[in-house]
Amino acid sequence: MALRSARGDGPTSGRWDGGAEKGDFNAKRKKKVAEIYQALNSEPTDVAALRRMAISEGGLLTDEIRRKVWPKLLNVNTNDPPPISGKNLRQMSKDYQQVLLDVRRSLRRFPPGMPEEQREGLQEELIDIILLILERNPQLHYYQGYHDIVVTFLLVLGERLATSLVEKLSTHHLRDFMDPTMDNTKHILNYLMPIIDQVNPELHDFMQSAEVGTIFALSWLITWFGHVLSDFRHVVRLYDFFLACHPLMPIYFAAVIVLYREQEVLDCDCDMASVHHLLSQIPQDLPYETLISRAGDLFVQFPPSELAREAAAQPQAEKTAASTFKDFELASAQQRPDMVLRQRFRGLLRPDERTKDVLTKPRTNRFVKLAVMGLTVALGAAALAVVKSALEWAPKFQLQLFP
């Protein structure tokens, strides 16, 4: 059951950052909607263009568009969604009681003012989706916070389509969170401090001295920020971004939040309790579009492959959610980027030109910022690199193309 009657299909990402005049804003929005539908109606579907639209300013704009685009980003066939039979699994599932407790505590994840009967119905559907996915994929292990991701897809897509997308997400982007241990989850968290160190060595050293660790970001990572953000518009905007990008992009976004709060952190007492308390209370008025742009820039500047050695000393440093994608490549026939984009990929993304001036960092000056942080992911070469990386990791179905 999609949530059309409760929230409608208006914009869910709020006004775009930048303070443009209303007329200009509306014109940009109409242009973007037209470009999205042009990509959707291409034969085959222009998934590369859809990824650019999801990353760029404002994201996918409405839940109606998300219902069409999110399945394309995950390469899910919407013509044959799985049957819903989770209710039959409640008595036999070892996870049922924990799932039930978590779902009962999820009241704030539903829109304010939603009729109680409708919310309770959605909570029942949420339980069924989770139990069905776990039953169909016995290698997956439920974790607290998983329901925060599932409910976002349920509210946008409805039960049947949400089941298909979350199942694909669970076996790829979220796979490491669903291991029997937290080892791989902790490894992904280990990317946080190396990213911060590349941009702001003083902030990194302060946090190391405080011994704050990375546990403050655990709920951000494993729920894709769904558990910590109160405005649903911000949550789905981030999901647009994450679904269009490499599976490790959420940890880059976590890093830019910490970097954005640099002065608050440095003004703290340099002890674990003070810094952890500050960082675990995520502000609700973050400049999301700016942070999305910066996260994309940092991913281009410092890709996971370059940070793996710092993230973990052992040779299996790349054993993260990204590793589950290595058997997936999109056939070129499934994509239709135009020649201009191809030329920009070839001409603008030369690592020697993009990185030579910023990889040497002074250890003492916290005001030194990367020039790349000024790039705009929505328009610049960084966006193309992020999309290109996402396409390299994106799922494929043998010879099955999008309808």
UniProtKB/Swiss-Prot annotation:
Entry's PROSITE patterns? TBC_RABGAP
* Keyword field contains tRNA-binding: no
Protein name (Swiss-Prot/TrEMBL): TBC1 domain family member 20
Q: Per the entry's comment, what about the domains?
A: The arginine and glutamine fingers are critical for the GTPase-activating mechanism, they pull out Rab's 'switch 2' glutamine and insert in Rab's active site.
Record site feature (Arginine finger), residues = R105
User: Site: Glutamine finger. Where?
Assistant: Q144
Sorted alphabetically, which keywords does the UniProt record give? GTPase activation, Membrane, Transmembrane, Transmembrane helix
